[in-house]
Design a protein with these regions (language model features):
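Conserved PLP-enzyme active-site core in the AAT-like
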Residues: 1-85
Length: 88
């Protein structure tokens, strides 16, 4: 959003949920006007998350910081290893 996007889409399934037990995504809007224009369609077409799936995603979000920290740490270790590899 800070780079000028009107809408940002996030995969709740992969990152926020984190346990492969929910299929969801979310849209973040940079203005309430754009949100209001699309809300009716989102609501009436049934493209909103169910209460149970929202709870599952919320449960997974509680470990997001820990999982992201571990993923970053692992990526750094892999990068260090690859940096020293003679064929790379």
């Amino acid at each position: 959003m800070t780079l000028g996007a009107d809408v940002v889409m996030h995969s709740i399934t992969k990152y926020i949920g984190g346990h492969s037990d929910v299929v969801a995504g979310c849209l973040c809007f940079n203005s309430s006007e754009l949100y209001d224009r699309l809300f009716f369609n989102i609501k009436t077409m049934g493209t909103c998350i169910s209460p149970f799936d929202a709870w599952i995603a919320l449960r997974g979000s509680k470990t997001l910081a820990l999982r992201a920290e571990k993923a970053a740490s692992n990526a750094l270790e892999i990068g260090k290893m690859l940096e020293k590899h003679p064929k790379i």
